[in-house]
A protein has these predicted regions:
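A short, Lys/Arg-rich alpha-helix, primarily the initiator
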Residues: 1-10
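Residues that mark the N-terminal boundary/hinge immediately upstream of a DNA-recognition element
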Residues: 3, 14, 40-43, 54
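The alpha-helix within a helix-turn-helix
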Residues: 8, 19, 48
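Short, charged recognition helix plus adjacent turn
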Residues: 10, 49, 59-72
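Short alpha-helical DNA-recognition segment
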Residues: 12-34
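DNA major-groove recognition helix of helix-turn-helix/homeodomain DNA-binding modules
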Residues: 23, 42-57
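DNA major-groove recognition helix of helix-turn-helix
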Residues: 33, 43, 62
Length: 72
């Protein structure tokens, strides 16, 4: 999950900050980031929102970091 770690660092966030933003326990987040644990759809959504990116970017389906426009 290099993409996830790189984007988190690019945003200047620690794993503890990600815990606060996503509600995902820091130890679980660390396992997700190192590939020792998969994230659920809901966790992926929370991570994407916290990092201001798309779930597609996190999944490696696109190289575009900017999220799609949000539906109002």
């Amino acid at each position: 999950m290099n993409r996830l770690r790189n984007l988190r660092k690019e945003r200047g966030y620690s794993q503890v900050k990600m815990q606060i933003l996503t509600g995902i326990d820091q130890s679980d987040y660390s396992k997700i980031e190192t590939g020792k644990r998969y994230y659920t759809f809901e966790q992926c959504k929370r991570i994407a929102l916290a990092l201001n990116t798309s779930m597609d970017y996190l999944a490696g389906l696109t190289d575009e970091k900017d999220p799609y426009p949000r539906v109002k």
